Swiss-Prot record:
This is Protein CysO. The lineage of its organism: Archaea, Thermoproteota, Thermoprotei, Desulfurococcales, Desulfurococcaceae. Pathway: Amino-acid biosynthesis; L-cysteine biosynthesis; L-cysteine from L-serine: step 2/2. PROSITE patterns: CYS_SYNTHASE (PS00901). Its EC number is 4.2.1.22, 2.5.1.47, 2.5.1.65. One of its GO terms (molecular function) is cysteine synthase activity. Pfam families: PALP. GO terms for biological process: cysteine biosynthetic process from serine. It comes from the Archaea. The modification N6-(pyridoxal phosphate)lysine is found at K127. Optimum pH is 6.7 for O-acetylserine sulfhydrylase A activity and 8.1-8.8 for cystathionine beta-synthase activity.
Length: 389
C-alpha cells in the first residue's frame, strides 16, 4: 500500500458529472478515513471525492485505509517566511485565511469567529477561490489567448480579470448599473473589458445576454452561478479551512453563518461541516424582501447548490440598514472593517442568538470582503450611528 500524489489524477475529474461523488466525500469526512484504491483511475468518483475535501494524496493498494491527516487534508499552513515565487503560488500557499475571535458579546454563550476572506490576493474577497478553480480547470482544454467572460456584481469580475490574465486569457465582465464602482474600475485596471448594463436590475438578469453573446462571439462563458467548480473550490478551500482551523484552534464549533450570492461558499461550508458533524448549524442569509445588499440575493432568484445538496440550514433575512449596523459594531468592537455581506451574516447570527435559537459555543461567520470597498455605504451608516468616543 502507498500514498500517491493526487495531482497525477486530476485528468479524471472532468469525467465525473453530477453530485453522486459527494456521498463518498460525506462518508470519508464522517468516518475520518478513506479506503485504499486498487486502481484509482477506475474509480473517478472516489478520486474526485478525495480531491474536493482537500486531500493531496490518494491511498493506493488493497485492504487498507488512511486517515484524513495521512491524506493531507490537514496540510494547511502559511509559509513562515511569506515568500512566494508567483502570484498564483501566493494564492495557493498563502492559506488559510485568518479566523479571528471577535470581541462582540452575543447572548446565550454564542462566541463569534470571523473568517476574513479579504486575505485572498486578487479581488480581496472570497471570489478568488472559484475564479482560480474555474480558470485552472479551463486551462487544461481551452487555448491560451481565448476570451473568458461572466456576469458579476463586482468581486468575481475583479477576481476573474486577474486570474484570467495570469493564465494567459483575455477577460470580459458584465455588470448591472447598480454595481459598486470598484467592480467597474478594477477589471479595467487588470486589462479586462467591462460592459455595464444600466437597465439590468441584478447580476442574474445579465445571464441571458452573456449566453447570447457567448454563442454569437464564441467566447467562453465561465458561469459562476452554475459551474460546479465554484462549489468545489469552496469545499477544497473555505469549508476545509474552517474544519481544520476549528480543530487546531480547539473551537467547540456549533455553527457557521454566511450570506448567499451564488450559494457556492455557504453550500460547501454546510455540506462539509455537517458531513463531519450533522449537528452543526448553518445560518444562511439573504436580503429582506424589497431590500438590496451588495453581493447577495434572495434564494428565489435561483441558486443551484443550496437546492441540490442534502444540507440542513436556517434561512435568515437582514436589511441593508441592519447589515451596515453590524459593520459599524464590528469596526468599533474589533477594529476590523468588514463588508456589508459580512455584516449581514453577523447581524443574522446576532438575531438568532438573541432569540435563543443557538446553542452555546463557537460560530464561524464567513466575511466575504472588506468594507473599504463600500465607503458610500459606510458614510450613510455613520450618519445614523454617529461618532463614538
Amino acid at each position: 500500500m502507498a500514498l500517491a500524489d493526487i495531482s497525477g489524477y486530476l485528468d479524471v475529474l472532468d469525467s465525473v458529472r453530477g453530485f453522486s461523488y459527494l456521498e463518498n466525500a460525506r462518508e470519508v469526512l464522517r468516518s475520518g478515513e478513506a479506503r485504499c484504491l486498487g486502481n484509482p483511475r477506475s474509480e473517478p468518483e472516489y478520486v474526485k471525492a478525495l480531491y474536493v475535501i482537500g486531500a493531496s494524496r490518494i491511498p493506493v493498494g488493497d485492504g487498507c485505509s488512511h486517515t484524513l491527516e495521512e491524506l493531507g487534508v490537514f496540510d494547511i499552513s502559511v509559509p513562515g517566511e511569506m515568500v512566494f515565487p508567483s502570484p498564483l503560488d501566493f494564492f495557493e500557499r498563502g492559506k488559510p485565511t485568518p479566523l479571528v475571535r471577535s470581541r462582540l458579546q452575543l447572548p446565550n454563550g454564542v462566541r463569534v469567529w470571523l473568517k476574513l476572506e479579504w486575505y485572498n490576493p486578487f479581488s480581496l474577497s472570497v471570489k478568488d477561490r472559484p475564479a482560480v478553480e474555474i480558470i485552472s480547470r479551463l486551462s487544461r482544454r481551452v487555448e491560451k489567448g481565448s476570451l473568458v467572460a461572466d456576469a458579476t456584481s463586482s468581486n468575481f469580475g475583479v477576481a476573474l480579470s486577474a486570474v484570467a490574465r495570469l493564465y494567459g486569457y483575455r477577460a470580459r465582465v458584465y455588470l448591472p448599473g447598480a454595481a459598486e464602482e470598484f467592480g467597474k474600475l478594477l477589471p479595467r485596471l487588470l486589462g479586462a473589458q467591462v460592459i455595464v448594463d444600466p437597465e439590468a436590475p441584478s447580476t442574474v438578469h445579465l445571464l441571458p445576454r452573456v449566453m447570447k453573446d457567448s454563442k454569437n462571439e464564441g467566447f467562453v462563458h465561465v458561469n459562476q452561478f452554475y459551474n460546479d467548480a465554484n462549489f468545489e473550490a469552496h469545499m477544497r478551500g473555505t469549508a476545509r479551512e474552517i474544519f481544520v482551523q476549528s480543530r487546531r484552534g480547539g473551537l467547540a464549533l456549533r455553527g457557521v453563518a454566511g450570506s448567499l450570492g451564488t450559494s457556492g461558499h455557504m453550500s460547501a461550508a454546510a455540506f462539509y461541516l455537517q458531513s463531519v458533524d450533522p449537528s452543526i448549524r448553518a445560518v444562511l442569509v439573504q436580503p429582506a424582501q424589497g431590500d438590496s445588499i451588495p453581493g447577495i440575493r434572495r434564494v428565489e432568484t435561483g441558486m443551484l447548490w443550496i437546492n441540490m445538496l442534502d444540507i440542513s440550514y436556517t434561512l435568515a433575512e437582514v436589511t441593508l440598514e441592519e447589515a451596515m449596523e453590524a459593520v459599524v459594531e464590528v469596526a468599533r468592537s474589533d477594529g476590523l472593517v468588514i463588508g456589508p455581506s459580512g455584516g449581514a451574516a453577523v447581524k443574522a447570527l446576532a438575531k438568532k442568538a438573541a432569540e435563543g435559537d443557538l446553542e452555546p459555543g463557537d460560530y464561524v461567520v464567513v466575511v466575504p470582503d472588506t468594507g473599504f470597498k463600500y465607503l458610500s455605504l459606510v458614510q450613510n451608516a455613520l450618519e445614523g450611528a454617529g461618532d463614538s468616543v
